[in-house]
Amino acid sequence: MKKLILSIFLCCGLTTNIMAQNENEPFKGYYYNDEYNIYLKIDLHSDGLIVPEHEIFGKLPGYLGKKYNSFYWLITTKDIKNKKKAIVEFINDYGSEDLEASLSKKEDGTIILKQLNGSDLKVPNNGKWQKIPKEITLKKK
């Protein structure tokens, strides 16, 4: 009986801890957009993400990638304004284009990526460059 009660308290404590982490780190996770087959992997609260097959860049706060492709837009700088908004700067993995964007966290857990200044966000698609809209919604996975 004591083990059962202890187990229940531990489970409740872990659940509360996990929920608190999500509230304290709103700009962390994996977000995707099925229409353009792109995803955003971010941890703006630390510089701890390694871009697959691009380890030479070291640890970064995040990156935007395309499914089934090794092309990336790397997040080089971040500025968390509050729990619902952050400003980030991207550079493509060739270093030839860069842009500034805002990330807005919505109540349903989605993120709105809005391009502010700089180059257009483009990703490879069937041998051509596909422009991503200036504002796009990414769902949390």
Task: Describe each PLM feature range.
Residues 22-100, 120-141:
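Central antiparallel beta-sheet cores of small beta-barrel/beta-sandwich binding domains
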Residues 1-23:
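Bacterial Sec-dependent N-terminal signal peptides
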Residues 2-3, 17, 105, 131-134, ...:
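Basic side chains
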Residues 98-109:
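Extended Gly/Ser/Thr-rich low-complexity repeat segments
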